[in-house]
């Protein structure tokens, strides 16, 4: 009785590296636009149900061929990630909390019934790719190498045949206005996610349907959408949302919607909550006095509450967070045919948002050591 050979896992030890014969010029930082200048190389691997994962390759970036009837085209069976590499003070590349991104990528792939992979092995492969593309990482605050892992199904119905690749692009500030406060259009009749859906996963089917309402917001002069679920505030565009409130005891509440299945569990979101909880007992956030007590929490927040907090003078700041924007202030919300003006500040961010931004970017760049969040990519 014959036995089938064991399917191969995704293994960094099998990595094959084929470098490009000619390297492209790296654009100067001031010319960088998000996702427009791809680096010289990409990481690539394929999966089939008989052999498992192929030997991963780092090879020149370029197009490849897919069958027209691939499941990813017809049913949107794909998942992706977004993470960044930075130049540390020692000139070496480093990643920010990459294990969280890879774990989320694995969860998203599993939700789409895509083939499993070993997260630790994929992280080793991404480190190897970043080391190869080191020259593409721009230096300076607000600059980084954006890393996009992708996994797509290429079978018909079941997602048992797949391609996985990772591509990179140098990037500067995500928004043209830098830290300028965003103006959002609250969407009541169109929802991004719903209970029992896929809102907590980074899968393609969550993003395509948002393009039309985002364009509608842009056409009306707003920068992005504020997604609602009934009266509940959920996300801003593709970003998590925070509100800063004055407490009766003189402290400050920092609140964000809970992870109820409709909210993407953002790495930046988690980091903001952790840093706020550490101030001032374990470390002091730059620009905030040690006597300023922050009380971070996850709780439902509604447009009705937001307007009441404004009327009471309790709402101090509102900002969005994400891998691309880091911390972006929100200064206006279009809602029910009127604009709701939020507190704005010279320079963009309010004191709490700015303090969290400064500390977070210092950790990302390796200028401030915290909890092992900044991970070096060894050559």
Regions found by a protein language model. Give the residues of each.
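Helix-start/capping segments and mature chain N-termini
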Residues: 1-129, 153-379
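Internal, well-ordered alpha/beta segment that forms a basic, Gly-enriched binding/recognition surface
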Residues: 129-132, 140
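Extended, Lys/Arg-enriched charged tracts that mediate electrostatic binding to polyanionic substrates
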Residues: 137-152
